[in-house]
């Protein structure tokens, strides 16, 4: 399978696992969604459904790294970089319309199988937010708490938006991120805020 073809199938797998969860997605359902026969699925993913989910998490981990964590390392003021990170999450979760597959995979029997990958993403994300805030002059303890607050807000607002069928909840939180980042920042030059 070419890299482009594999990415296309992994994108389809993302949709299947988002909609059905890991435990709920059957090989028949995956076969139908990807257009690959069961034999082809096992040829490309010899480890079966577990390998498919690991591939999905690798794919999403790279996407999240490239589109969220990298924005924190980019150009602009601290609030602007956090705003860009929020915009990336808006895109990934389609404005709050799509659930977080990382949260889905932690439900049911799949948790033990994929905990390491999920832990790695969340740890990398929290560490990068903390690093940026510390470099801006915030003390480590406050920066860690602020990073956790932002991550909890993003994930929590997404779950609430899904549970209430109201994506505006997620959008409002994303829009509030720059203000939340500014709270607790030192008295740096106003031009740098």
List each model region and its residues.
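Amphipathic alpha-helical segments used for helix-helix packing
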Residues: 93-113
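Amphipathic alpha-helical packing segments from all-alpha helical-bundle domains
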Residues: 65, 111-136, 145, 175-182
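Hydrophobic alpha-helical connector segments
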Residues: 68-97, 140, 147-150
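Short, basic, alpha-helical segments at the C-terminal edge of helix-turn-helix-like DNA-binding modules
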Residues: 57-63
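Amphipathic C-terminal alpha-helical segment
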Residues: 92, 107, 151-169, 181-184
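Helix-turn-helix
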Residues: 8, 12, 16-55
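Short, basic, low-complexity termini and linkers enriched in Ser/Thr/Gly/Pro
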Residues: 185-193
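Hydrophobic alpha-helical segments that form the core
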Residues: 141-160, 172, 176
């Amino acid at each position: 399978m070419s890299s482009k073809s594999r990415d296309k199938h992994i994108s389809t797998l993302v949709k299947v696992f988002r909609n059905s969860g890991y435990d709920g997605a059957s090989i028949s359902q995956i076969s139908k969604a990807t257009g690959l026969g069961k034999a082809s699925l096992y040829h490309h993913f010899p480890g079966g459904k577990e390998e498919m989910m690991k591939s999905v998490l690798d794919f999403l981990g790279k996407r999240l790294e490239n589109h969220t964590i990298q924005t924190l390392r980019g150009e602009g003021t601290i609030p602007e970089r956090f705003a860009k990170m929020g915009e990336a999450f808006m895109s990934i979760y389609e404005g709050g319309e799509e659930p977080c597959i990382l949260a889905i995979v932690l439900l049911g029997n799949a948790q033990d199988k994929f905990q390491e990958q999920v832990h790695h993403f969340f740890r990398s994300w929290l560490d990068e937010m903390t690093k940026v805030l510390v470099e801006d002059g915030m003390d480590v303890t406050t920066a860690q708490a602020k990073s956790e607050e932002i991550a909890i807000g993003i994930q929590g607002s997404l779950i609430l938006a899904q549970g209430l069928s109201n994506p505006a909840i997620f959008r409002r939180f994303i829009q509030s991120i720059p203000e939340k980042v500014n709270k607790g920042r030192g008295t740096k030059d106003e031009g740098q805020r």
